[in-house]
Curated annotation (Swiss-Prot):
Gene: petA
Protein name: Cytochrome f
Species per Swiss-Prot/TrEMBL record: Thalassiosira pseudonana
Annotated binding of heme, by residue: Y31, C51, C54, H55
PANTHER family xref list: CYTOCHROME F, PTHR33288
One annotated GO biological process: photosynthesis
Cofactor note text: Binds 1 heme group covalently.
C-alpha cells in the first residue's frame, strides 16, 4: 500500500510539473489529476466520475471513437469540450483569466495509452505540449490530462492501443463500454472540501447592509445588522460582482454576488468492439459465398429461360 501511495504521489507531481512546463496556466483548479489523490477509483458505483465533485456545473461533452478495433491496433478517442472562447473566468487572485480544460478517459481493462513510437505524426502534432498520463500504476487503463489551454485544446485526443486476447487471457472479443469526462474552467470546490471563489455566496444572516468596503486586495467586506442589532461581516473574494448595495435589506442565504461560474463538467459513455481478424475474414468469406450463390442462381435462371424459349420456338 505504501509503495502504491508513493507512486501515486510521484505520478501526480510529475504530471503537474510537465503540464506547467508545457503551458503557463495561471492559478487553475481544473486539474483532473486532483482526483488521483482522493480516489483510488475515479468512477463511483453509481457511475458518477470524481471530477463532478469539484466541478458542480454540468456542461455537455462529445465523444468520437471507432466502433470496432483489431488487437494491437492503435486508434484515437476524441473528447470534445466545447465552450465560448470569448468568455473568461475568475482566477484565484480575482483577475480575469482564460478557461482551461481537462479530461479523463476510463477504458476497458487491457486497453492503455499508446507509446510514443506507436503514435502517428499527425496525432503528435495535435497533442504537442499535451501530457496524458495513466491514473495510477494500478489503473493504466484510466487516462487523465489537464489543465491545458482551452482556446487551443477543445478537442482532447487520446491515442490508445488495443489489447490482444491471444496474449492476455483476461481479454475477450467482446463489446466493451468506456467512459469519458471533460471539464472547462475552475471548480467550485477544492479537493480539501473548501469552496473556491467560483461560487455565489449567500448572506450569513438576514438584516440591513450598513456598510460595504473594499480591502487592499480588492475583496468586498459586507457588514449586515439584523433586527436584534447583531452585526456580522462577510468578506467576498476579489473579482466577484455584487448583487447588493449599502442600505439593502437581505434575507439569510440570499445571494450577495453574481454567480461567476462559466465552466462545467460533463461525462458520457460509449462502446467499442474488440474484433477478431479471423472472424472478419470468415464473415467476408461467408458474404462472398452468398454473392457467388446469387450469381450462379441468376445464371442458372437465364440458362433455364433460354432452354424454355428454344423449346417453344421448336
Amino acid at each position: 500500500m505504501a509503495t502504491n501511495k508513493f507512486f501515486k504521489s510521484l505520478l501526480f507531481t510529475l504530471t503537474i510539473a510537465i503540464s506547467s512546463f508545457g503551458f503557463c496556466v495561471e492559478n487553475s483548479s481544473a486539474y483532473p489529476v486532483f482526483a488521483q489523490q482522493g480516489y483510488s477509483n475515479p468512477r463511483a458505483a453509481n457511475g458518477k466520475l470524481a471530477c463532478a465533485n469539484c466541478h458542480l456545473n454540468q456542461k455537455a461533452i462529445e465523444i468520437e471513437a471507432p466502433q470496432g478495433v483489431l488487437p494491437n491496433s492503435v486508434f484515437e478517442i476524441e473528447i470534445k469540450v466545447p465552450y465560448d472562447v470569448n468568455r473568461q473566468q475568475i482566477s484565484a487572485d480575482g483577475k480575469p483569466a482564460d478557461l482551461n480544460v481537462g479530461g479523463i478517459l476510463i477504458l476497458p481493462k487491457g486497453f492503455k495509452l499508446a507509446s510514443k513510437t506507436q503514435i502517428s505524426p499527425e496525432v503528435k502534432a495535435k497533442n504537442k505540449g499535451v501530457f496524458i498520463s495513466p491514473y495510477s500504476t494500478e489503473f493504466d487503463n484510466i487516462l487523465v490530462v489537464g489543465p491545458i489551454a482551452g482556446k487551443t485544446h477543445q478537442e482532447l485526443i487520446f491515442p490508445v492501443v488495443a489489447p490482444d486476447p491471444e496474449n492476455n487471457p483476461d481479454v475477450k472479443y467482446l463489446t466493451y463500454p468506456f467512459y469519458a469526462g471533460g471539464n472547462r474552467g475552475r471548480g467550485q470546490v477544492y479537493p480539501t472540501g473548501e469552496r473556491s471563489n467560483i461560487n455565489s455566496f449567500g448572506a450569513t444572516q438576514g438584516g440591513q447592509i450598513t456598510e460595504i468596503t473594499t480591502t487592499e486586495k480588492g475583496e468586498s467586506k459586507i457588514t449586515i445588522v439584523n433586527s436584534d442589532g447583531a452585526t456580522t461581516s462577510q468578506t467576498l473574494s476579489a473579482g466577484l460582482k455584487l448583487l447588493v448595495k449599502q442600505g439593502d435589506i437581505v434575507k439569510q442565504d440570499q445571494p450577495l454576488n453574481i454567480d461567476p461560474n462559466v465552466g462545467g463538467f460533463g461525462q458520457e459513455e460509449s462502446e467499442i468492439v474488440l474484433q477478431s481478424s479471423s472472424r472478419i475474414l470468415g464473415y467476408l468469406a461467408f458474404c462472398f459465398c452468398l454473392l457467388l450463390t446469387q450469381v450462379l442462381l441468376v445464371l442458372k435462371k437465364k440458362q433455364y429461360e433460354k432452354v424454355q424459349a428454344a423449346e417453344l420456338n421448336f
